[in-house]
Amino acid sequence: MERHFEKVEEILKKYGYKRENLIKILLEIQEIYRYLPEDVINYVSTAMGIPPAKIYGVATFYAQFSLKPKGKYTIMVCDGTACHMAGSPEVLKAIEEETGLTPGNVTEDLMFSLDQVGCLGACALAPVMVINGEVYGNLTADKVKEILRKIKEKERESANV
């Protein structure tokens, strides 16, 4: 697939092609693509005069960057001790049953991606998952499936508008 770089170029211009703005630049690029594609990293490297290895170093050091496509809805399931004991394995199983996803993967339609993470800091609500920054706690398999079905329904409705 041939990619056009107009939006990337706008971001680079906005930040003056300055090295000290690399993290901001990468964050904005990731908002567009939902990850940092290799060809875009190479484009940024050439445009900014930064070796690709340096950009990959930044992209792999900071947890908020992804080199793999992410879904429109990024699901993070806590598997810290409290959540694990309270049922996070069942939460993961319910997500897999509803979406076909296993941790570290994305659905073919790029609707959902799933990450299994350490403590999310909401132990009192265990088991917990976060979808695009929204925390869902005290989960059961049925609650998880209901949440995901509502998201799917919302997406179907907005596609039909």
UniProtKB/Swiss-Prot annotation:
Subcellular location: Cytoplasm
Effect on the protein upon substituting D79P: Increase (30 mV) in the redox potential
Effect of V128 to E/K/L/M: Decrease (about 37-50 mV) in the redox potential
Protein source organism: Thermotoga maritima (strain ATCC 43589 / DSM 3109 / JCM 10099 / NBRC 100826 / MSB8)
Recorded superkingdom: Bacteria
Subunit structure: Heterotrimer composed of HydA (alpha subunit), HydB (beta subunit) and HydC (gamma subunit). Near neutral and acidic pH conditions favor oligomerization of the heterotrimeric holoenzyme.
Function: Catalyzes the oxidation of the physiological electron carriers NADH and reduced ferredoxin, coupled to the production of H(2). Acts as a bifurcating [FeFe] hydrogenase, which uses the exergonic oxidation of reduced ferredoxin to drive the unfavorable oxidation of NADH to produce H(2). The gamma subunit might be the site where reduced ferredoxin is oxidized.
Protein name: Bifurcating [FeFe] hydrogenase gamma subunit
